[in-house]
Amino acid sequence: TDYNIVLLPHVLMPADNDLDILETIAHEKKNERIRLLFEHLSAAEYKYVISKAELCIAARTHVTIAAYSSCVPTLAIGYSTKAKGIADDLNLEEYVIDVEEDKLQQKLEEQFLKLYKNKRQLKEQLKGKIPQYIQNATPQKLLDFLKEDMR
């Protein structure tokens, strides 16, 4: 690919550590276009990095949410029903791959090419859907409180 690739660990727990697999990928590929970003970033900084991506491939729900809410076309690797449910809400269900999928690597490659091909359309689709999605997800009482606080 001609893309620069940022590997961004999200979960760093002893029993469930993204850094382990991402270090393995970065080491095996030995490509200067692949960068493992492992600085202690705040949630806002992580979201900023994700928002600057042209495309996103993610297996963590919070990463997909950060990408979707930043209108970044995303291929979600789902390990739970949450990935499919969120994508369904945005009419992006065809861009979710079950981690248990047969021929996972082949499916990832096919879906990535589809994501790449349709990236402009998907970005516009997200721009059209995300504001309403956020409004629907935010309780009206909170919105009213925030409006009051801003006066």
Segment roles from a protein language model:
Residues 1-151:
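Active-site anion-handling motifs in enzyme catalytic cores
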